[in-house]
Swiss-Prot record:
Pfam families reported for this sequence: Amidohydro_1 (PF01979), Urease_alpha (PF00449)
GO-annotated biological processes: urea catabolic process
UniProt keyword annotation of Cytoplasm present: yes
Protein name in UniProt: Urease subunit alpha
Gene name of this polypeptide: ureC
Entry annotated with the keyword Signal: no
Residue list for modification N6-carboxylysine: K220
Cofactor section: Ni cation
Residues binding substrate, per UniProt: H222
Origin species: Micrococcus luteus (strain ATCC 4698 / DSM 20030 / JCM 1464 / CCM 169 / CCUG 5858 / IAM 1056 / NBRC 3333 / NCIMB 9278 / NCTC 2665 / VKM Ac-2230) (Micrococcus lysodeikticus)
Pathway(s) where this gene product acts: Nitrogen metabolism; urea degradation; CO(2) and NH(3) from urea (urease route): step 1/1
Chemical reaction(s) catalysed: urea + 2 H2O + H(+) = hydrogencarbonate + 2 NH4(+)
Sites where the protein binds Ni(2+) 1: H137, H139, K220, D363
Length: 571
């Protein structure tokens, strides 16, 4: 016998279902549930008098060894590059093992995830689940960045640095074997996934190759060390030999060549371009043109995202500090001014919205904010919907699903693909490491409810530890048990080169964290960037800096009010 209830009542009990729309934070973006993998009338719900009890929704006979999951997240709406859908998510041995309908097949229909005695439950009713975010442009200057990143929904940090040295503040590089080994040992303490970039500067292969053998997952070419054609070519030769990525911050001053010369040095090989608009650094004024080519994997850093009335004004002073410039030297001031172009910044949001720019990242403490990768990505999406309307694929629908999938891909699956770690992280798919972030819809993209690493809860909003229940004020982010002791070894991954792992380096360094190799990078093209693989013709007018896509000018207006801002933060 069936029992009918209203959609509103159903959503209040079990969360939204197919056809329901969810507003994301205070934006104008609405996610519509495309599919519900649970069974109506057979929902698995935990609590007093609820379903998941002995002999009801829980099977009390099966032992863990037959495949009973360690954790089930019930009735949650997933927002991922793969789709926007409702499901139960099963985690076992730190990995996602099933997506579908959880419960007890002895008493319920349609069960493909068996909840057993060994199973913990997180209630996802009315909440949103995403993959953990990936920041590929991290200057490792302060360890406090890691807590800030976790509390924003990031679970993987890729970049370089050794602490607050001048070169680390500027160049996202961990140079040389000794520094790389020191940083790899430091990462043992943190419930965060890490990968290091070595110094991609040298006229011979050996000094760069030894950094890959020392555990770096790629090389960084940066103008502050000299982004010369020779360095670019040599770094890419090493990358091709070891199957790693090269990230590049090109030559703003055009001292060693123009954008055409950099493109010639790259010579069709895949490369990850940082802050491809140029305010963060790169050939002035036309670095943005590189994003049209299929071997270029272009990203933005978040200080220019979204374009606001304050963006240009804050950038000059920020740049002077980040790149060790002297405000009393006219040459240094001119260098800074050349990078800050209102016209290309105004085009950047549109290029992100069109799927021409594929990724977002932070440039943490070096002209970017590590805790705002997600916020600023979604602020761009909101600004573009307000200014450009629905994307063509979303026309005539009740929501913004195509745009939402495009933007969530920018900080999840696409950076994972770019750095050869997509078989481990970057999406909510069976077989992936269970790096998951749970959100209340009204706080989506701003403040996570719970951060899960490798199936373990590592960070979440919890109340007074002396409270009689978990919710009394003050409620703030606190570490959970997966962030302590030896649990960190299984809740987080250190990514290293295949060559270093084959040589036994993790054991030699005494590393205890889960180790994974990067791979499958050198054959990538922009077509591999999910929902963000467009390659139209791009041009920048050398005098006016106007940006054109297939001959048409692109720009947007600066925003003076943003969502996901003052409503959520005091400062």
């Amino acid at each position: 016998m069936s029992f009918e209830i209203s959609r509103e009542q159903y959503a209040s009990l079990y969360g939204p279902t197919t056809g329901d729309a969810i507003r994301l934070a205070d934006t104008e973006l609405f996610a519509v549930v495309e599919e519900d993998l649970t069974t109506p009338g057979e929902e698995a719900v935990f609590g007093g008098g609820k379903v998941i009890r002995d002999g009801m929704g829980q099977n009390s006979q099966l032992v863990r060894d037959v495949g009973v999951p360690d954790l089930v997240i019930t009735n949650v709406v997933v927002i991922d590059w793969t789709g926007i859908y409702k499901a139960d998510i099963a985690v076992r041995d730190a990995h996602i093992v099933a997506i579908g309908k959880a419960g007890n097949p002895h008493t319920m229909d349609g069960v493909d995830i068996v909840i057993g005695v060994a199973t913990d439950v997180i209630s996802g009713e009315g909440k949103i689940l995403t993959a953990g975010g990936i920041d590929t442009h991290v200057h490792f200057i302060s360890p406090d960045q890691i807590e800030t990143a976790l509390s924003s929904g990031l679970t993987t940090m890729i970049g370089g640095g050794t602490g607050p040295s001048e070169s680390s503040k500027a160049t996202t590089i961990t140079p040389g074997e000794w520094n790389i080994h020191t940083m790899l040992r430091s990462f043992e303490h943190w419930p965060m996934n890490f990968g290091l970039l070595g110094k991609g500067h040298g006229s011979s292969i050996s000094p760069m190759a030894e950094q890959i053998r020392a555990g770096a997952i790629g090389l960084k070419v940066h103008e502050d060390w000299g982004a010369t054609p020779s360095s670019i070519n040599t770094a890419l030769q090493v990358a091709d030999e070891y199957d790693v990525q090269v990230a590049i911050h090109t030559d703003t001053l055009n001292e060693s060549g123009f954008v055409e010369d950099t493109r010639a040095a790259i010579d069709g090989r895949v490369i990850h371009t940082f802050h491809t608009e140029g305010a963060g650094g790169g050939h002035a004024p036309d670095i943005i043109e590189l994003a049209q080519y299929p071997n270029i994997l272009p990203a933005s850093t978040n200080p220019t995202l979204p374009y606001t009335t304050n963006t240009v004004e804050e950038h000059v002073d920020m740049l002077m500090v980040a790149h060790h410039l002297n405000a009393d030297l006219p040459e240094d001031v001119a260098f800074a001014d050349s990078r800050i172009r209102q016209e290309t910044i105004a085009a950047e949001d549109v290029l992100q919205d069109m799927g021409i720019f594929s990724m977002t990242s932070s440039d943490s403490q070096a002209m970017g904010r590590v805790g705002e990768v997600l916020i600023r990505t979604w602020q761009v999406a909101d600004s573009m919907k307000r200014q450009r309307g629905p994307l063509p694929e979303d026309e005539g629908t009740a929501g913004d699903n195509h745009r939402i999938k495009r933007y969530v891909s920018k900080y999840t699956i696409n950076p994972a693909i770019a750095h050869g770690i997509a078989d481990s992280v970057g999406s909510v798919e069976v077989g992936k490491f269970a790096d998951l972030v749970l959100w209340e819809p009204q706080f989506f993209g701003v403040k996570p409810d719970l951060v899960i690493k490798g199936g373990q809860m590592v960070y979440g909003v919890v109340g007074d530890p002396n409270g009689s229940i978990p919710t009394p004020q003050p409620r703030w982010y606190r570490r959970s048990f997966g962030a302590y002791g030896q649990a960190v070894h299984t809740s987080a991954i250190t990514f290293m080169s295949e060559a270093s792992i084959r040589a036994g380096l993790p054991r030699a360094l005494g590393l205890q964290k889960t180790i994974r190799a990067v791979h499958g990078i050198r054959d990538l093209t922009k077509a591999d960037m999910r929902h963000n693989g467009e390659t139209p013709r791009l041009e920048v007018d050398p005098e006016t800096y106007e940006v054109r896509v297939d001959g048409e000018p692109v720009t947007c207006e600066p925003q003076d009010v943003l969502p996901m801002a003052q409503r959520y933060f005091l400062f």
